[in-house]
């Protein structure tokens, strides 16, 4: 099933790129929480929803662009968790650092994940405890890698005072910044060793990247040391967390 989900992510990426390259208008509007949404978000959402309903008609889907109410999803044990365009701010800035995120959740855990960066044409995927990166038609298994000093990857668009204080206390390290779920993927492929997050995220922002990072050997825990959990709950917000090889 992983190959079909990867192809679905590519199809969604193609729909996004039609807006990104100007073939179709971007049409940026603000949602109720003031976050931006574009025609590309909606186009990718439609592609993924149609594809998953065909691929697995018995598994419900939670997408950022049309999340079901709590009364609908409170008893879900297995479901798809989708962010059709993660990094909308990066998309609007046209820096290429946005992704298509698709994850399969089973009893609170992301057991399959796909993160596709359309501009870079890079696909990260994970299933059955293994993670891969596909680039230029070549697919290879990836895993975490230690480095000294460690490279800490941080958000391009969401810096905060807590993060600054954390980094000051961390000891010797280097930093890099990138948008969207690519932060998880940098840790997964051994380029970075730590991704700390204090600012708010939603479950669709993290599930696919979580699957990839965990399958590559990283730990994805909240600041109390518990694995991020995707068991249905009323709020979509995650706690703060860190993705680490240590």
Swiss-Prot record:
Coiled-coil ranges per UniProt: none
| Function according to Swiss-Prot or TrEMBL | Converts adenosine-3',5'-bisphosphate (PAP) to AMP.
| Keyword tags | Cell inner membrane, Cell membrane, Hydrolase, Magnesium, Membrane, Metal-binding
Name the record gives this protein:
3'(2'),5'-bisphosphate nucleotidase CysQ
One GO biological process from the UniProt record?
phosphatidylinositol phosphate biosynthetic process
Name the EC number(s). 3.1.3.7
Q: Which NCBIfam families is this protein grouped with?
A: bisphos_cysQ (TIGR01331), PRK10931.1 (NF008182)
Molecular functions per Gene Ontology: 3'(2'),5'-bisphosphate nucleotidase activity; magnesium ion binding
